């Protein structure tokens, strides 16, 4: 696999809608920063540069899956940039949480819409295993990129095509997490903190990574949440397979290499 040479350096992000106070806070709280095709990765002071570089390699491969040094889907990348998508990294859970809290304090002090800001931000703990890098970075790409580029298809709301596929996978439409999923379901996430849009985000991740082979040896670990863990089993999810394989959307066809 081609090696990517990436450098970590301070970037003063252009955030005209939020102002210089927020920009300065981001630079102070998350001083280790890099961009991948214009998409921002920011890390706390103690986040190891090697881990930020690893995240950058993964993001680059999710966006440029065919390795031709340009994004596969410019619409998706444009939405990531337009919506100020940010991957925020901390070395440990405590490091990331404290840094988030500090940033939220700044947002509230300068009267920024916290909910709107958080919708475009995904957190990643650098000490987590590789599978977490695949998951959280893909969440950023799908939640901020694909969902905004193709809302009628990948929008994280009832009525989009991916939501219809998910409702089949869950055994029906459930606005809130049910106590028990139907027996015919193969996607049954019981985290009550995960609302309907969150369920769509997770469903996209499980579907794509199962199709690409990331979950083959993890059935015992993940079956309580996800049963279709192999490319062969994914054939059962016909509607989602149509979306994942449609040439128009340029969905990644191979897993990123670490």
Where in the sequence are the language-model features?
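Sec-dependent signal peptide recognition
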Residues: 2-10
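Pan-zinc metallopeptidase signature
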Residues: 201-258
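Acidic/His-rich structured neighborhood in mature extracellular/periplasmic domains
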Residues: 27-29, 36-182
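A general structural signal for short secondary-structure junctions and capping/turn motifs
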Residues: 2-3, 76-81, 194-197
